[in-house]
């Protein structure tokens, strides 16, 4: 079964990208290998990432990269073990701030219903705080394990 949900890839692009804004895709294999690709359109991203989705975990940048990142070797393709990847110093503008809330529990365990409810309550408080303090509407997501 293929793990790439193409509709979700388009949803990501339409929600978090601005036109032909660059995005780095970082891939991490179970054996520790890394790969990187830099894309400015979703069709190339999907085509290049698709072969990796069954055996690699896929991550992406949410904030803006400089236009000259198009000059890196992994522009519009995936390179395994690249010499250079994007880093925090390359971010030119922060469009998003990611807030990750997790319950305190043993590593490798799922949250109890009580922990999920508590974390949801905290997430609602954070959401309201951001809204009350002038932040743009939030993108809210919930993982499957609490």
Protein language model regions, located:
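Short amphipathic alpha-helix segments
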Residues: 118-135
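Alpha-helix boundary/N-cap detector
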Residues: 4-7, 117, 121
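DNA replication initiation on ssDNA origins
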Residues: 1-96, 101-109
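Short, flexible/disordered intra-domain loops and linkers
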Residues: 107-118
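Active-site-adjacent structural elements in folded domains
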Residues: 82-84, 133-136
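Short, conserved phosphate-binding/catalytic loop or strand-edge motifs used
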Residues: 139-146
